[in-house]
Amino acid sequence: VVARAWPLAALLAASPLAAQEVNISGLTDINFGALRPVSEARRAQSVCVFSNLPARGYMVTAQGSGAGGAFVLDAGGAGELRYGVEWSDRPDLDSGMPLQPGQALGGQTSTATDATCGSGPVRTASLVIVIPAADLAAARAAAFSGTLTLTIAPQ
């Protein structure tokens, strides 16, 4: 009886991680209408953010339409109007953590259970836009507009 030992090699491939998915829905245009420069102007809307990570974590980054992503509204020749952006990972709030252009705010958690927010909580976060009273007082009468881009990333 002859016994031979053959080397045994096994190639074990790690299973690919499930694709990390995040989604934001429920965003609408924010219209301030005619404003009086007596106090700050604040508008909030509740949105839905979904994250499929086990802890449902995400980070949010905001970019405005001003130079370098600044949060400004433009009125063409009438100038610009600065605004602030706040975020909360809870819905129905009119204040949150201040965001800076291009800087991610991490540590956010979603309660959404469905990627399209069609079932479970339909609103999970608050977006707040604030125009400071001093900026309103210094602004010329005009129609101002701008674009805010939000990026949601898994965390």
Predicted features by range, described:
Residues D92-G120:
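Extended, solvent-exposed segments with strong compositional bias
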Residues A14-P16:
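N-terminal signal peptide c-region/cleavage motif recognized by signal peptidases
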Residues V1-P7:
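Bacterial N-terminal signal peptides that target proteins for export
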Residues A19-S88, A112-Q155:
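N-terminal small/polar-rich segments of proteins
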